[in-house]
C-alpha cells in the first residue's frame, strides 16, 4: 500500500509600480506526509525458503497465517516471560516534509522593443525519513538492531521507529535577470542566473546524533537565443545555453555522515538550430540539437535480491560524460475545417563519453534478516560508447483530430 497527502497553500501578490514596472510574487507552503508498506524481519513464505535464497527459488507466497501463528506463540525469556516476540512484521516507510518558498519577479518595459525581468527564488525544506511498525502479526513486540544507541537490540511496538531515522534540510536561493528584444523581423532573448544550495543531515540512529552541514554549493546558468522571420511563412531560430546543476544530497553528504570534500556541479552546454514554416493549411518545425553533459551524477537501484524488497542496493555514479545529438521534426495539416493531422519524428544518438566512478552501496543483515548497517565499495564502471538508457532516442507519432 502507498499513501500520501500533500497540501499546498499559495499567497499571490501583484503590484503595478508604474505604467512600465510590474511586481508579482508568490509565497507558498507545501507539506507532505505518507509512505509505503512492506515486510520487515523474517516473514514466513510458502513454500518455506531458507535464508536469503528466496530470490532464486521457485514461485512462493507470503504465509501470513503461519507467521501470525509463529509470532503468537514465541515467548523469548531473555526479553519477557509472558509476551510474544515477533520475528517478522509489517512496516511503513514514511516521509514527512515541509517546504516554504518565495518567488518574486519584477518586469520593466525599457522601451517598446526591450523588456527586462529580474527575479529571486528562495525555498527551504525539511524532510524526515524513517520506518515504523505497522503490524506485529500476532506478536506483542519486535526486537530491532538498527539503532546504534541500542547495540543489544531495542524493543519496539506499534508505531515505533525502526530500521532508520534521519532528517535532512535543503536551503535554496537563486536570482536571475533576463531580457527580450523584439523589432521588425528580429527577436533576441538572453538570461543569466546564479544560485546556491546547502544541505544538512542528521542520523538519529547514530550514537553522535549530530547535525552535519555541508558548505553551500554555487551554480550558474546562461542562455541566449534568436529568431528571424524571413517572410510571413518562414522563420529561422537558434539557441545556446550553459547550465550548472548542483549535485543531489547523496553525492554531498554520504549515509555515514561523511561530507564530500569538493563535490562537482553537473554541467551541460546545449545548442540547437532550426526552421519554422507555416501556411494557411500546413505547418512544420524542424531542428537539430547537440548537448554535452559533464560530471553528471546518477543513482541506480540494483535488483540483487538481497533484503526485504529485492532492490535495496544502490550505485551512486559520478563524473559521467554524455553526448546527446539528434533531429526533431513536427508537422501538422488542416485537411478540412473538421479534420487536423499531426505527425512528429525524433531521431537521436545519446551515448556515454568515457567511463565513470561509482560507489556500490548495499545493506548488511543479521541472521534474522534485520538491517544492521550499510557497506560501500568503490568501482570503475565501463560506460564509454554505450547508449544512454531509460530514454527513447527514436520515436514517431501520428494523430488525427476530428
Predicted region positions:
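Signature of Gram-negative outer-membrane beta-barrel scaffolds
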Residues: 89, 115-231, 248, 253, ...
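Gram-negative outer-membrane beta-barrel transporters
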Residues: 112, 182, 290-292, 316-402
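Extracytoplasmic loops and strand-loop junctions of Gram-negative outer membrane beta-barrel proteins
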Residues: 1, 6, 82-91, 156-163, ...
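Surface-exposed extracellular loop regions of Gram-negative outer-membrane beta-barrel proteins
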Residues: 6-10, 22, 37-42, 47-104, ...
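Surface-exposed loop/turn segments flanking beta-strands in extracellular/periplasmic regions
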Residues: 44-81, 130-161, 256-262, 299-316, ...
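Membrane-embedded beta-barrel scaffold of Gram-negative outer-membrane proteins
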Residues: 20-28, 229, 235-241, 264-327, ...
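Outer-membrane beta-barrel transmembrane strands
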Residues: 2-38, 86-117, 128-129, 160-187, ...
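Structural signature of outer-membrane beta-barrel domains
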Residues: 4-5, 30-36, 97, 123-129, ...
Amino acid at each position: 500500500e502507498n499513501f500520501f497527502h500533500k497540501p499546498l497553500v499559495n499567497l499571490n501578490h501583484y503590484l503595478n509600480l508604474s505604467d512600465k514596472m510590474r511586481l508579482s510574487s508568490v509565497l507558498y507552503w507545501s507539506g507532505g506526509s505518507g509512505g509505503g508498506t512492506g515486510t520487515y524481519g523474517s516473514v514466513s513464505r510458502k513454500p518455506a525458503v531458507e535464508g536469503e535464497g528466496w530470490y532464486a527459488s521457485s514461485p512462493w507466497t507470503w504465509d501470513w497465517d503461519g507467521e501470525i501463528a509463529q509470532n503468537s506463540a514465541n515467548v523469548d525469556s531473555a526479553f519477557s516471560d509472558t509476551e510474544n516476540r515477533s520475528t517478522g512484521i509489517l512496516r511503513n516507510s514514511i516521509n514527512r516534509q515541509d517546504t516554504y518558498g518565495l518567488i518574486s519577479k519584477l518586469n520593466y518595459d525599457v522601451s517598446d522593443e526591450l523588456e527586462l525581468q529580474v527575479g529571486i527564488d528562495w525555498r527551504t525544506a525539511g524532510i524526515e525519513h524513517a520506518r515504523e511498525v505497522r503490524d506485529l502479526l500476532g506478536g506483542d513486540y519486535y526486537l530491532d538492531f538498527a539503532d546504534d544507541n541500542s547495540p543489544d537490540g531495542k524493543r519496539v511496538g506499534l508505531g515505533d521507529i525502526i530500521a532508520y531515522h534521519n532528517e535532512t534540510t535543503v536551503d535554496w536561493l537563486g536570482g536571475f535577470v533576463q531580457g527580450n528584444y523584439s523589432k521588425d523581423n528580429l527577436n533576441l532573448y538572453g538570461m543569466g542566473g546564479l544560485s546556491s544550495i546547502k544541505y544538512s543531515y542528521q542520523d538519529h540512529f547514530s550514537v553522535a546524533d549530530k547535525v552535519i552541514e555541508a558548505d553551500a554549493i554555487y551554480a550558474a546558468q546562461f542562455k541566449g537565443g534568436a529568431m528571424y522571420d524571413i517572410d510571413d511563412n518562414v522563420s529561422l531560430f537558434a539557441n545556446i545555453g550553459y547550465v550548472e546543476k548542483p549535485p543531489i544530497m547523496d553525492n554531498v553528504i554520504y549515509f555515514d555522515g561523511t561530507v564530500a570534500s569538493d563535490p562537482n556541479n553537473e554541467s551541460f552546454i546545449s545548442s540547437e538550430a532550426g526552421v519554422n514554416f507555416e501556411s494557411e493549411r500546413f505547418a512544420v518545425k524542424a531542428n537539430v540539437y547537440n548537448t554535452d553533459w559533464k560530471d553528471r551524477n546518477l543513482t541506480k537501484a540494483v535488483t540483487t535480491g538481497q533484503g526485504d524488497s529485492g532492490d535495496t542496493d544502490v550505485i551512486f555514479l559520478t563524473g559521467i560524460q554524455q553526448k546527446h545529438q539528434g533531429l526533431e521534426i513536427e508537422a501538422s495539416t488542416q485537411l478540412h475545417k473538421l479534420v487536423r493531422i499531426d505527425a512528429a519524428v525524433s531521431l537521436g544518438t545519446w551515448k556515454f563519453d568515457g567511463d565513470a566512478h561509482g560507489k556500490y552501496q548495499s545493506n548488511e543483515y543479521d541472521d534474522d534478516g534485520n538491517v544492521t548497517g550499510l557497506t560501500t565499495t568503490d568501482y570503475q564502471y565501463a560506460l564509454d560508447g554505450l547508449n544512454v538508457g531509460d530514454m527513447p532516442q527514436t520515436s514517431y507519432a501520428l494523430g488525427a483530430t476530428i
